[in-house]
């Protein structure tokens, strides 16, 4: 530990944050979120680099997404650009993993007696808590979609599956 409050490989992580910010700048005019495990706590340089590039961290206020050696913090973040901020209805961390006992950890399969008696559940399915993001996508003034053709009961009239995803305006 270098004693500077930064995690391992700080210069590399700052460079990665800069590269992400440069890439995401292409979408500045579109609502864009940067979401995931940034492997940096909120006061570390990589997070500060994203904030300096104009990204607002909209997650994690007082919430922990990760626990290591009994100490909690947040390595998982949600950042929004100015175009995305009006769409946010809420952001929170779902405390389903990090605070659970390591005895229940997903990677310990075969070593845990509890797996023989417990039903499948989301607890300790990762070592990080997921971020939950609420979005308001359609306002009250949005027009209702209109069908492009009359519905048919003939199964042959259905479009055939395609390997290419379709674009939705």
Description of each model-found segment:
Residues 1-10:
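Active-site His/acidic residue clusters
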Residues 10-18:
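Non-membrane alpha-helical structural segments and their capping/turn regions in soluble enzymes
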Residues 14, 22-33, 38-147:
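Metal-dependent phosphoester-hydrolase catalytic domains
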Residues 140-169:
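Ser/Thr/Gly/Pro-rich low-complexity, disordered linker/stalk segments of secreted
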């Amino acid at each position: 530990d270098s004693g500077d409050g930064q995690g391992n490989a700080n210069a590399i992580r700052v460079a990665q944050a800069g590269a992400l910010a440069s890439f995401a700048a292409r979408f500045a005019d579109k609502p864009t979120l940067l979401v995931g495990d940034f492997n940096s706590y909120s006061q570390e340089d990589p997070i500060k680099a994203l904030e300096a590039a104009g990204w607002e961290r909209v997650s994690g206020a007082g919430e922990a997404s990760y626990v290591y050696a009994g100490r909690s913090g947040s390595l998982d973040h949600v950042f929004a650009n100015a175009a995305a901020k009006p769409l946010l209805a809420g952001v929170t961390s779902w405390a389903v993993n990090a605070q659970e006992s390591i005895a229940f950890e997903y990677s310990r399969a075969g070593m845990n007696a509890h797996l023989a008696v417990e039903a499948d559940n989301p607890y300790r399915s990762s070592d990080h808590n997921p971020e939950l993001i609420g979005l308001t996508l359609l306002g009250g003034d949005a027009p209702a979609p209109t069908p492009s053709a009359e519905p048919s009961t003939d199964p042959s009239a259905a479009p055939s599956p395609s390997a290419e995803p379709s674009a939705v305006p």
